[in-house]
Amino acid sequence: MHAVVVNVEIDDPDAARKGLEDLVPTIEQAPGFVAGYWIRLDDRHGISVVIFEAEDQARAGAPPADGTAPGVKMTGVAVGEVLASA
C-alpha cells in the first residue's frame, strides 16, 4: 500500500469543509482507494492521508504540489510506502 500525504493551510474553514463534502466521494471512487483521513490540526492547518493499494494509483490520485482547493492552499504533497498499520 502507498499513502498520499497532503499538508494544507486553511484560508476559509467553511469553504474547506464544503470542498471536502464534494471531494471525498470522488476520492472514494479512485482506482485502488483503500481509506482516507482529513485532519484539522488547528484553525489554519490541516493534513490528509489517503491510502491506495499501489504506488502508481497513489501517484495518480495525488494533487499537484502547488495546488489549491476551496478554502485551502496545499503546502506539501508526498507519496510514500505504508510500512505498517494497526
Where are these regions (language model features)?
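Short S/T/G/P-rich N-terminal loop/turn motif that feeds into the first structured element of a domain
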Residues: 1-47, 53-86
